Curated annotation (Swiss-Prot):
Residues 4-281 form the tr-type G domain. SUPFAM superfamilies: EF-G C-terminal domain-like (SSF54980), P-loop containing nucleoside triphosphate hydrolases (SSF52540), Ribosomal protein S5 domain 2-like (SSF54211), Translation proteins (SSF50447). It comes from Borreliella burgdorferi (strain ATCC 35210 / DSM 4680 / CIP 102532 / B31). Belongs to the TRAFAC class translation factor GTPase superfamily. Classic translation factor GTPase family. EF-G/EF-2 subfamily. The keyword Ligase does not apply. The gene is fusA. This is Elongation factor G 1.
Length: 693
């Protein structure tokens, strides 16, 4: 394989922009599949890249299936990424290992909310991109408008490389503005490309658009600028070089168009991928040297150097765990010994394969820059594999925090075992899916990037792991505390024949206001009124009493306890007697110390178009939010607020519907704060009602 010709590309888009259909056509024209199936087609086959049963049913792409194709002797690895906001980690993951991308846009809807999110991710990983304006056959198609939106909404220097021949139901082909030729796609499935002269009624428009294209490209090539200014003909190769230079420098976004569904324009888009998107040689990648203070090391596309590879996706295959790997340096071959830099464990490379959606092709080795898959390797997503002579780690992928939680409960013993297996699998596969058991409520809580994200996992539990589960709302982790000082003087006495129990503890409790501490114990006992060996028993008893408050049954925090007096009995006093005395003393004083309830307060950040700023403020105010800051950056707004966690459930859905899906939010724990009296009363009533029942 000529690695200078290799292209690692992703296809990113808003949901329903026709991205999976485009990928399907690419597979067909590259002879990887021999029949075309629609995403939600009548034949029940579904798109080839949507290999998970659930994806085919919903008609949305969930897992980024990888496939290897060849176009005119250029090897291309394609990662098909999900277009729904809830699957953002899949997009982030694939962009991490890509060298270039195709941004697919709907010719009617144009730049949509997820296009903005995807573009932000492409920028985060400095991925050069081409734009493909799809669905030019749709009613209301306007590719020129989409090209303008790329500038106004995404701030991309978009340049038309083609114009359409007809739109809506009259869309029959495209005009190439570089070659100044018209292209039609005929024969069954558009496999016959017919090159003709530009129709006379479109010639003037084509000339005018070519002028604009050359003006834009002149910034990237001095020779082109001179020839264009002198009114001379610019050679095709110079135009291609200028386009490639601008694209690789992330200063240009060439725009192509067509209709994947109607088989128009796909082959010319593939030509553009090979011409304008980078090979692994064109991209700088770095690793951190763990043996040298995490010093940044430049990696080289060279098969002779020590191997460095990144595991970027895990799947359960029929032969065990399938690990997708991008090779950044050196080679991967069967039988090779590597080390996982996170665990320091050595392993041997077993079966090495190339993927075509969910079909596999065994290979002997993969070279620098390639994307391959391994079977039977124990690892987590994001792990780095390297030659044992070095200890490098690829910089970690940006992983957004989960924003929604749900409690899950297995319906029976078999489901409980299967659910445990499923949760173990999912957390390994997806770093944005988290799970834990809430110690206080004993519920299993799952967390993710949105309702659909968690729904898909609950469905997968049922289908793949045969785990029947019920879902509910998770409980907020409240706390209790006191608001004033209170004294205690409590005697624990149990004398009913035989060994008795006796212990008296006196002192006071007060609110503790110390950063990072929730409990403090002070011993002011003098003259041995409580023997030294029983002081730890008192401490233990107070801490035991704080495990469950009397208001709503949650742990008690932020209390300082001081003991200054007491009494013991030479026979009946014991460790347990003083523990019980301390528990009694605590409860006696707690009621007098005016206890209250604390709730988790989250730092919430909303980002979205300025036109929705009012909606964002409104949503936060409705949720007892306190706005702490806002920032306007042209058409984009950022709002920061402190909001109680209990008000944030279901927020992603509400935010999406009130901002047309154009705003995003992140949330992290900030501190505990006192609940208002109305909430206090509600929580008390709920707790008392539960205890009665």
């Amino acid at each position: 394989m000529d690695y200078n010709k290799l292209r690692n590309i992703g296809i990113s888009a808003h949901i329903d922009s026709g991205k999976t259909t485009l990928t399907e056509r690419i597979l067909f024209y590259c002879n990887k599949i021999h029949a075309i199936h629609e995403v939600k087609g009548k034949d029940g086959v579904g798109a080839t890249m949507d290999s998970m049963e659930l994806e085919r049913e919903r008609g949305i792409t969930i897992a980024s299936a990888a496939t290897h194709v060849e176009w005119k002797d250029f090897p291309i690895n394609i990662i098909d990424t999900p277009g729904h906001v809830d699957f953002t980690i899949e997009v982030e993951r694939s962009l991490r290992v890509l060298d270039g991308a195709i941004l697919v846009l709907d010719s009617v809807a144009g730049v949509q909310s997820q296009s903005i999110t995807v573009d932000r991710q492409l920028k985060r990983y400095s991925v050069p991109r081409l734009a493909f304006v799809n669905k030019c056959d749709k009613t209301g198609a306007n590719p020129y408008n989409v090209k303008d939106q790329l500038r106004s909404k995404l701030d991309l220097n978009s340049v038309l490389m083609q114009i359409p021949i007809g739109l809506e139901d009259k869309h029959i082909g495209v005009i190439d503005l570089v070659l100044m030729k018209a292209y039609y796609f005929e024969g069954k499935d558009g496999t016959e490309i017919i090159e003709k002269e530009i129709p006379s009624d479109l010639l003037e428009e084509a000339k005018s658009k070519r002028e604009i294209m050359l003006d834009t490209l002149a910034d990237f090539n001095d020779e082109l600028m001179e020839l264009h200014m002198e009114g001379k003909e610019v050679p095709t190769e110079i135009i291609y070089n200028a386009t490639r230079t601008g694209t690789l420098a992330l200063k240009l976004c060439p725009v192509f168009m067509g209709s994947a569904y109607k088989n128009k324009g796909v082959q010319l888009l593939l030509d553009a991928v090979t011409r304008f998107l980078p090979s692994p040689h064109d991209i700088k990648n770095t690793a951190l040297d763990l043996n040298n203070n995490e010093k940044e090391i430049d990696l080289k596309i060279d098969n002779e150097l020590p191997t460095v590879a990144l595991a970027f996706k895990l799947e359960d295959g029929q032969y065990g765990q399938l690990t997708y790997v991008r090779i950044y340096q050196g080679i991967l071959k069967k039988g090779q010994e590597l080390i996982n830099s996170r665990t320091s464990k050595k392993f041997k490379v077993g079966r090495l394969i190339r993927m075509h959606a969910n079909n596999t092709e065994d290979i002997e080795f993969g070279g620098s820059g390639d994307i391959v898959a391994l079977f039977g390797i124990e690892c987590a997503s994001g792990d780095t594999f390297c030659d044992p002579s070095i200890n490098y780690s690829m910089t970690s992928m940006f992983i957004p925090d989960p924003v929604i939680s749900l409690s899950v409960k297995p319906k029976d013993k078999k489901s409980a075992d299967n659910m445990a297996k499923a949760l173990g699998r999912f957390t390994k596969e997806d770093p944005t899916f988290k799970t834990y058991v809430d110690i206080e409520s004993n519920e299993t809580i799952i967390q993710g990037m949105g309702e659909l994200h968690l729904e898909v996992y609950i469905e997968r539990m049922k289908r793949e792991f045969k785990a029947e589960v019920e879902t509910g709302m998770p409980q907020v982790a409240y706390r209790e505390t006191i608001t004033r000082k209170a004294e205690f003087n409590y005697t624990h006495k149990k004398q009913s024949g035989g060994a008795g129990q006796f212990g008296r503890v006196a002192g006071f409790m007060e609110p503790l206001d110390k950063e990072g501490e929730t409990y403090e114990f002070v011993n002011l006992i003098k003259g041995g009124v409580i023997p030294t060996e029983y002081i730890p028993s008192c401490d233990k008893g107070f801490q035991k009493a704080m495990e469950r408050g009397t208001l709503i049954g949650f742990p008690i925090v932020d209390i300082k306890i001081t003991i200054n007096d007491g009494q013991y009995h030479i026979v009946d006093s014991s460790d347990i007697a003083f523990q019980l005395a301390a528990i009694g003393a605590f409860r006696e004083a707690y009621e007098k110390a005016k206890p209250t309830i604390l709730e988790p307060i989250m730092k919430v950040t909303l980002e979205g178009p300025t036109e929705f700023q009012g909606n964002m403020f409104g949503l936060l105010n409705q949720r007892r939010g306190i706005i702490t800051g806002s920032l306007e950056d042209g058409s984009f707004s950022k709002v920061e607020a402190e909001v109680p966690l209990s008000e944030m459930f279901g927020f992603s859905t509400v935010l999406r519907s009130s901002t047309q899906g154009k705003a995003e939010f992140s949330m992290e724990f900030l501190r505990y704060g006192k609940v208002p009296s109305t909430i206090f009363d509600e929580l008390r009533k709920k707790f008392n009602d539960q205890n009665k029942s």
